[in-house]
Amino acid sequence: MAGNKVETFLKSELKKKNALLFVLIDSEVSNLEASAKLAKDVEKIGASAILVGGSSATDQIEMAQVVKGIKKGIKIPIILFPGNVTGVVPDADAILFSSLMNSENPYFITQAQALGAPSVLKFGLEPLPTAYLVIGDGTTAWFVGSARGIPFEKPKIAAAYALAAQFLGMRFVYLEAGSGAKSSVTPEMVKTVRQLFNGFLIVGGGIKDVKTAQNLVKAGADALVIGTFLEKGGSLKKLEEITKAIQRSK
């Protein structure tokens, strides 16, 4: 998918479906066969994209194999979601080219991006300019990214970052409670961010049931990211229920 095909596809899916499901496959957790099967299964139940990545330092060769293996069996886009430069691999359609805006380490704000950018160009990946905001603390994303986690009960801080991202030209904001988070981002925070940010709003972390998913979409989320739920034995049937419910929620 060259040019801005993936971004255009996501926007047209959003018009049709009201809200989208992105399924995150962590290449460190899933083996090649399981990843390829999961990608096919979630495409069937209505997922709009597969994210491949993870917060910890990933084996680049392993990740490239996972992407290649998934690509053969699905039509929906594969979007890289790298935790570091090692997460930039060929064969995907796009990349969440993100800055961890509330990191205390400049490496995760601009340096990793400068190191990874030539590979993004070389591999022909479509960059989706994304402000990545870690909400709360105690998760892998918070620890690895040296994030100064935005407190769950301080939605205006998240909204200020999202507005800054918009002024910097970023068209995507990702509010991340973290992989396997005990609780999800609050609907109040999503609503507050939505009032100021007019781009594509992604919310992930701790989404395990229909009600949570519906409330986040009603508050203004465009896409929900679910990953650990499936790793920890969540059923595809439950995921299908969530997918159908969010498409009726706005």
From Swiss-Prot:
Keywords from the UniProt entry: Cytoplasm, Lipid biosynthesis, Lipid metabolism, Magnesium, Metal-binding, Phospholipid biosynthesis, Phospholipid metabolism, Transferase
Listed GO MF terms: imidazoleglycerol-phosphate synthase activity; magnesium ion binding; phosphoglycerol geranylgeranyltransferase activity
Key word Cell membrane present: no
GO biological process terms, semicolon-separated: glycerophospholipid biosynthetic process
Co-factor requirement: Mg(2+)
UniProt-listed Pfam families: PcrB (PF01884)
Gene Ontology cellular-component terms listed: cytoplasm
Pathway: Membrane lipid metabolism; glycerophospholipid metabolism
Family annotation (NCBIfam families): GGGP, GGGP-family, PRK04169.1-2
Name of the protein described by the UniProt record: Geranylgeranylglyceryl phosphate synthase
The organism of origin for this protein: Nitrosopumilus maritimus (strain SCM1)
